[in-house]
Amino acid sequence: MSGKVVSSIREAIEAAGLHDGMTVSFHHHLRSGDYVINMVMDEIAAMGIKNITLNASSLFDTHAALVQHIKSGVITGIITDYMSAGLGKYISAGVLERPVKFMTHGGRPAAIMDGRTPVDVAFVAAPAADKDGSCTGKTGRSACGSLGYAFADAEYAKKTVVITDGLCEKLEQPSIDGKFVDFVVEVPEIGDPKGIVSGTTTI
C-alpha cells in the first residue's frame, strides 16, 4: 500500500516542512480519548522544533501532558475553543509566552478559512482512512462520528496529515476527500474509545 502513506509521524512532519515558528492544528472529536495531539507534539519536541502555535478545536484533561512542551518552549501560543482544567489551571498562571486566543466553534474555522489564523500543518486524527487520504470518523474501532471540526483544517492548511488506526485500500464514503490530504500515517491507536464518549457527549 503506497499512495500518500508514509512510514511514521516524524517522516510526515519532515515531508510537510514543519519548522520553528509555524502553526499546527488538531480537531477534538476524540475528546478525552485522544492520543494524537500528545503523540504529534511529543515527536515535534523530539525533533527540536520550537515556538509552535497550537490551534486545536478543544483541549481536554488528557492533554495536560502538553505542559512539558510549554515549559520547554516548544509550544508558545495556543488557539482553541475550549480548554479543561488539566491544562487550563497551569496556563492561567501566566506561563505561556503569548495569551491563549479563545474562539467559538464557528469562529475558529472561519478564521482559518479567511486567513486570520493560517495553519501550516493540520494533523487530522481519523478512525478510518485510505491510502490516498480520504477519511471518516463514522467507521473503525475508534469511530467518533463526524469529523466536521477538521474540515477547515484539512482544506485550508498548507499541508494536511491524516493519522489513522484504520487504514484501508479504498474508502467509499469519506467525510474528508483525499484531495485535501498530503500524507497518511498509520499508528497502532489514535485514541481510547472509552474516552471518546465523555463529558457533554455522554447520554
Task: Identify the residue ranges that each predicted region occupies.
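Conserved alpha/beta enzyme-core scaffold
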Residues: 1-203
